[in-house]
Amino acid sequence: MANLPLFITPSILSADLGRLQEEVASIENDADGIQVDVMDGHFVPNLSFGAPVVKCIRTKLPVDVHLMVSNPQDRIGEFMALHVANITFHAEAVEDTNSRRALIEAIKKGGATAGISLKPQTPVAAIDDVVRLVDLVLMMSVEPGFGGQDFLPDVLPKIA
């Protein structure tokens, strides 16, 4: 396997929203990007940020939006309008190959790179249909929907 680049992209999920700009600034020299976890309370049981928070982030770093939502195709427009660098959606939220391909194409046409994410228990083979079309694969090492969870080491063999 080729040596692929490694990117450090911390999530703002656990950030103090009252000091969000300060917290973003504190990592700008050490991070390769900022990840914004968008949760809808349906795909995952929690709610989090949306486009208004992304709009408020002032940074030189690329913003990576991780959509933990049902029907991600209905949400990409609001983030593409903000010129985010990457949009990642969950394979489990879009199970049909044609729908996945259409979503990846729409993200790329909108000027962002496209990523696909897998929950810890989802086999890597679940994305064989589109893995060569995406720019990144996010292997969740916690159950999506909550911050501050313990790392699930069973995910490591999927990465190798």
Regions found by a protein language model. Name each.
Residues 1-88, 93-109, 113-114, 125-134, ...:
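Conserved N-terminal beta1-alpha1 strand-loop-helix module at the mouth
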Residues 116-118:
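Short loop/edge segments at beta-strand edges and connector loops
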